[in-house]
Amino acid sequence: MSNRVIPLSVQLGKLKHYFPNSTNYMDIHTNRLIWKTTLQPSELSLAYEIKIVYTLGQSPKVYVVSPKPLALADGAQRLPHVYDHVKQQLCLYYGPAREWPPDKMIADTIVPWASEWLLHYEFWLVTGIW
C-alpha cells in the first residue's frame, strides 16, 4: 500500500467521468466532497439515489437517499449491514480497520461496492437472507 492520499479533485474527476449526470459539492476549506448519483444494480433493479460524503484521508460514508425509507424484508425490524438504520448509511467495509485506504479511487471501489450492496439488498427483500 502506498499510503498516498488521492486529492479530492482527482477523485471527483473520475466520479464525473464514469457518472456524468451526477451532482457534487466540494468544499476545499474542509477537504470534503459530497457526491450524489443514481445506481441501478441490474436491469431489473430499482434505481437508487446514493450520496457519498468523503473527507480527505478518512473513510467515505455512503447513504441511500432515495427511496427512503428502504423497504424491509418480511419480519425484519431493521436493515442489515448498515451503520445507521435511520440515515441508511451502508456498511460496505469495516471503517475502524481501515479496510478502505485513501490511496484508492472511490469510483473503482466504493461505488461498485454500493451497487453490490443494493443488489444483495434486493435479494434480501425477496428471500429474507443476506
Residue ranges: model-predicted function:
Residues 1-34:
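Charge-rich, low-complexity N-terminal segments
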Residues 4-8, 35, 41, 121-124:
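Structural preference for beta-rich elements and adjacent junctions enriched in aromatics
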Residues 5, 9-12, 76, 87-89, ...:
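Generic N-terminal initiation segments characterized by hydrophobic and/or small/turn-forming residues
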Residues 23-96, 104-105:
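Compact alpha/beta protein-protein interaction domains typified by the UBC
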Residues 88-130:
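Ampiphathic alpha-helical segments that act as solvent-exposed interaction surfaces
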